[in-house]
């Protein structure tokens, strides 16, 4: 069988969904509806939990250059909006931001305004790997809920049943080898039994340092490869190549 490992761990953005879907559809959607969303859900328990995380993150970020504080009182809503936009502009991957984004996307998916993009090779290959007895997981900087919504409301319908579990940065940063050890412990396997697919070299390197195997994906619109760094990994253009005998 071409894939020896029993566990397939998938990055999402740039691996099984396009970077352009995230950058040109999901992120702009948050920016577009953020003010209305906060106004609509401000008093909801779910948003208040998001707000608590945002305030805690603001304390951590208070010494960061350009930091936008979250205030109380009459300007509270505006300050939250400005803080979220600041985090997004600076491509911060905080749990607080990702959780709020996930809830906003959920609203968009449920209303039919969003549909999760998947490359056309993804579902056929993952279904075959599942038939082979492989266990499929994801690991993304997006929250586990955001991942679930993408698959539940995908352009192909609800395909969330393929994935046994979703992991996010609560396991640790994707560029840290400890994160992959944490995931292995969480699903009770050895790192050597995990094949991690990603389009980011530092993530692939971290996974390998942890003892996992890693394959590098080259998709349209992904960042240019660094030949020196990427040469250490098997490089594929579609998941179909996982089913080929080398």
From Swiss-Prot:
Its cofactor is Mg(2+). One of its GO terms (cellular component) is cytoplasm. Its EC number is 3.1.3.77. It is found in: Cytoplasm; Nucleus. Substrate binds at residues 140-141, 174. Mg(2+) binds at residues 11, 13, 199. GO terms for biological process: L-methionine salvage from methylthioadenosine. Pathway: Amino-acid biosynthesis; L-methionine biosynthesis via salvage pathway; L-methionine from S-methyl-5-thio-alpha-D-ribose 1-phosphate: step 3/6; Amino-acid biosynthesis; L-methionine biosynthesis via salvage pathway; L-methionine from S-methyl-5-thio-alpha-D-ribose 1-phosphate: step 4/6. It is an enzyme of class 3 (hydrolase). Pfam families: Hydrolase. The keyword Nucleus applies. The keyword Cell wall biogenesis/degradation does not apply. PANTHER family: ENOLASE-PHOSPHATASE E1. HAMAP family: Salvage_MtnC_euk. Bifunctional enzyme that catalyzes the enolization of 2,3-diketo-5-methylthiopentyl-1-phosphate (DK-MTP-1-P) into the intermediate 2-hydroxy-3-keto-5-methylthiopentenyl-1-phosphate (HK-MTPenyl-1-P), which is then dephosphorylated to form the acireductone 1,2-dihydroxy-3-keto-5-methylthiopentene (DHK-MTPene). This is Enolase-phosphatase E1. It comes from Acyrthosiphon pisum.
